[in-house]
Amino acid sequence: MGSCVLCSIVGQGSNSLHVTYQYLDNVTTHLISRPGEREKLPFTLQDVRAAIPAHCFQSNLWRSLSYLFLDFGMIALLYLAAAQINRAWFFPIFWILQGTLFWALFVVGHDCGHGSFSRYRRLNHFLGHICHTPILVPYHGWRISHRTHHANTGNIDTDESWYPVTETQYHNMAWYEKLARFHLILFVYPLYLFRRSPGKQGSHFMPESPLFRPHEQKQVLTSTVCCVLMMSVLTAIGLHYGWGFLLKYYGMPYLVFVVWLDLVTFLHHTDEDIPWYRGKDWYFLKGALSTVDRDYGIVNAIHHNIGTHVAHHIFITIPHYHLLEATAAIKPVLG
């Protein structure tokens, strides 16, 4: 394997947010090829599923819609408050709150992408665009690459994102790739949408990208057109009201949203003790269990309990409002 560059959490337990970057030789190799890792887990996917109450796998359309309406309603109220107050002291507060709600809206669209929002596929895709287009996420492009991530979680060779890279890969990376991945990791999501992760080819916006199958290209094009239209609207706002206005009311909340997305996904897939597998050492359940649950305190309810990540990775069709119950149910099985 050789030495790896790994973004890792340093501190006591999984609640620490102090991030460092370090070369890990023996440690990373140990995590990838730890003795005994080839052995099967003492429980199966069926064992885990059997522990979860059946209703946890059922989505409720009206309940799902209530979260969608709540997020859009709060976003609208914050815009109204910002316009009414219109004081310099309020805008930093507005940026943090609104950016957090943009992130919450992304999570609702995330449920649409997994099919856990409702049992109606076309409705899921329509509402997924309603959630993701305003925050410049190409819904289908993201949905399909995210599917790849879930199908390969914990596989160092095929996972879509947040995987450690070898020292050789590190030295072969362009300077801007090193800058983005190891120094600006909380701001790289827009770049990832255009370029993917280091060593991966393609773009979430381009239908002919190797990310997508031929029959998916029209869907990807639809999402790209939606994002282009959104950019046109934002450009028109900037031209009419001024670029400072656009930055103040959209650009800064969008930046906070990007930080939330990168921070949360980083924390769910990075820890000093997380193993990475390759080849026959990997299989789906082992990979899914290499994710990490995180507690975000009062933000848990705002961003729809996305911190319950292990249960989500094992069963992507569980709606976010059932993940807490599902997590509690599987703990005795997982040990």
Protein language model regions, located:
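Non-catalytic, topology-defining segments of multipass membrane proteins
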Residues: 2-99, 132-252, 321-335
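C-terminal, well-structured subdomains that either form a transmembrane helix-short loop-helix hairpin
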Residues: 300-333
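Multipass alpha-helical transmembrane domains of eukaryotic endomembrane proteins
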Residues: 204-220, 266, 270-298
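Acidic (Asp/Glu-rich) catalytic motifs at the cytosolic membrane interface
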Residues: 102-121, 142-155, 264, 268-271, ...
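Residue-level signal for cytosolic alpha-helical hairpin/rod architecture
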Residues: 127-128, 187, 307-311
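Juxtamembrane/interfacial segments around transmembrane helices
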Residues: 125, 173-181, 230, 271-284, ...
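Juxtamembrane helix-capping/reentrant segments at transmembrane boundaries
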Residues: 117-136, 159-177, 278-295
